[in-house]
Amino acid sequence: MSKANQKIRIRLKGYDHKAVDQSAEKIVATAKKSGAEVSGPIPLPTEKQIITILRAVHKYKDAREQFEMRTHKRLIDILSPTPKTVDLLMRLDLPAGVDIEIKL
């Protein structure tokens, strides 16, 4: 494993910002404990999806209701990871509402 240009990029996505932040802190603490350099967590722009529906069925076109869904995202870069770092990250237990993408 050549350490010259090794980098692990982790993207976290979730609807609950507390769970996303908590997962990011766990990942950063685990990576630092194994001796790797960590850049982040970097907050990325929050996606906001708004859905508008009609409240009434027939003639009440002005009566509408809006719902929104926010997707919070964080980015973590682990620079010069060790084999111990990868092993500890694989064993890490994270909440169910957080989507994790890992790129090497």
UniProtKB/Swiss-Prot annotation:
Record-linked Gene3D superfamilies: Ribosomal protein S10 domain
Name by which UniProt lists this protein: Small ribosomal subunit protein uS10
Pfam family, one: Ribosomal_S10
Keywords associated with the record: Ribonucleoprotein, Ribosomal protein
Function statement: Involved in the binding of tRNA to the ribosomes.
Top-level lineage group: Bacteria
Gene: rpsJ
Record keyword Mitochondrion present: no
Family label: Belongs to the universal ribosomal protein uS10 family.
Keyword Ribosomal protein: yes
GO cellular component annotations of the record: ribonucleoprotein complex; ribosome
Matches recorded under NCBIfam families: PRK00596.1 (NF001861), rpsJ_bact (TIGR01049)
SUPFAM superfamilies per UniProt: Ribosomal protein S10 (SSF54999)
Subunit architecture: Part of the 30S ribosomal subunit.
Swiss-Prot/TrEMBL GO biological process terms: translation
Organism: Alkaliphilus metalliredigens (strain QYMF)
GO molecular function, a single term: structural constituent of ribosome
Record PROSITE patterns: RIBOSOMAL_S10
Lineage, uppermost ranks: Bacteria, Bacillati, Bacillota, Clostridia, Peptostreptococcales
